[in-house]
Amino acid sequence: MRLSQFKQTKNVELVVDTNSLEEYRAPSNKSIRLCKDKRSFLDDKGYWNVYPIAFNPAQVFVVCPHCGKIHLHGRGQEPDFKYEGHRASQCLAGSNNGYIIKRGNHV
């Protein structure tokens, strides 16, 4: 989903201020606004590492470093909510190897 759609999502617990996400226009369509999370980084094995931007009771929300949209994944079960680990990116941004969701809110 795009950032504008995410901002309208109800019943989410934000981990970061959405104003801290860097917005940019999609190269293929300047009317589409995408975003980057400055906390994301590419590790030495070639995997993107991303951090949650929000949660709801069942899901974790992250900014996809491949397409610039917000993706959601299962949060896991209480009490641990083990959402971290490798995930497929679920986007059509060409061939990519997904990303690793990290626990925490690192800057």
Protein language model annotation of sequence segments:
Residues M1-D37:
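Glycine- and charge-rich intrinsically disordered segments
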Residues K69-R75, N96-I100:
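Short functional micro-motifs and their immediate structural scaffolds
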Residues D80-V107:
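Short metal-binding segments enriched for Cys and/or His
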Residues Y51-Q59, D80-G85:
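Short, flexible, mixed-charge glycine/proline-rich loop motifs
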Residues P27, D37-I53, H73-G76:
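Short Cys/His-rich Zn2+-coordinating modules
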